[in-house]
Amino acid sequence: DCADSDCTGNPACPVGGTAIGGSCELKTSAGTNVKGTYSASRVNYKAGIEFDAGPESMLYASVVTGFKSGGQSNADINPYLPEDVTAYTIGSKNRFFGRMVTLNAELFLMKYKNRQENFSALDRGGAQVSSLFNAGRAEAKGASVDLTIRPTGNDTFRAAVEYTEAKYNDFVYRNYRAGNPTASTACVVNPVVGGSAAVGFWTIDCSGFQLPRTPKWSGTVSYNHTFELANGSKIDFSPDMSFASSRWLSAEIVENARAKAYALFNASLTWRSADDAFSVQAFVRNIGN
C-alpha cells in the first residue's frame, strides 16, 4: 500500500505538488515556506581480525559500516535519504632488514547505498541553488602500497601509490532547468515522463561513470637527508612529489569540471638548532608550475 508515499520511500506529494516521473515537483515563489519532518537512525559495527605471520609481519582484515544522515534538499521538497557504506579491507604490515625497510599493502572495497552527492540546479522558482540528492548505489575498490626505506640514520625514502576503481552502479537523478542539458554533461539525458522540455524536467543517467574527486592512480614520493653540522645543529633537505590521474570534480560529470592528471614537485631546506628549540625553513612549492 503506497497511499502515504510514492513507493520509493519519499512521502506522498503534498497539496500544491505535482507527481512527475516518480518525484514530487513543487514550483514555489519567493517567500514560500515548505515544512516537514525527517528522522533516521542506524546501528553501525566494526569487526576485524589480526594474525602475526612472523616477528615483523602482520596480516589483518576488517569490515566496517558507516552512516550519513539524510535531510531536506534545497532544490525540491523531496528529502534525501541516509547514505550507508560498508568497507572491507585486507592487508599486511611488514618490516625487513632490522626495520630498515617497512612495506605495507592493502586491498579495499567500499559499497555505498543511497550515496549523497551535491550539485547545482534550479529550484522550482527558477533560482540557482546547491542541492543534496541520492545518487543510488556506488562502489570503490582498489589497492594501496606504502614503502619506507631508511638506509642510514640520516636518510629516509618514502613512496606510496594507490589504484582505485570507483564508479556509480546506479546513478539516475532529475534536474529542473531551461533547455536541453545534453551539451553540458557526458551522461545520458532524457525528458522526464509526464514532463516536457518546455518546463525543463530531465532525467540524467550517470550510471557507470567514475566517482567525482577519485582518481584511478594517486601517490607520493619523498626523500629526506639530514646534514649534521659541527656545532650540533642540523639541516634537512626534503624534496617530494605527488601525482594523480584525471578525475571529475563534480557529480554533474561536466567536461569543463574534469581535472587533468598532474605531478606536483616541492622541496624544502630546514635548519634546526642543536636543541631543536627553533628552526628556519626555506621552501618551494609547485616547482615547474
Each model region followed by its residue ranges:
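Structural signature of Gram-negative outer-membrane beta-barrels, strongest in the C-terminal barrel
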Residues: 1-111
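Transmembrane beta-strands of outer-membrane beta-barrel pores
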Residues: 1, 63-69, 96, 107-113, ...
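Gram-negative outer-membrane beta-barrel transporters
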Residues: 109-111, 133-251
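Conserved C-terminal beta-signal and adjacent last beta-strands/turns
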Residues: 86-89, 102, 209-289
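Solvent-exposed loop segments that connect transmembrane elements
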Residues: 1-38, 72-76, 114-133, 169-207, ...
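Hydrophobic, lipid-facing positions within transmembrane beta-strands of outer-membrane proteins
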Residues: 43-49, 76, 86-90, 131, ...
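Membrane-embedded beta-barrel scaffold of Gram-negative outer-membrane proteins
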Residues: 52-66, 82-172
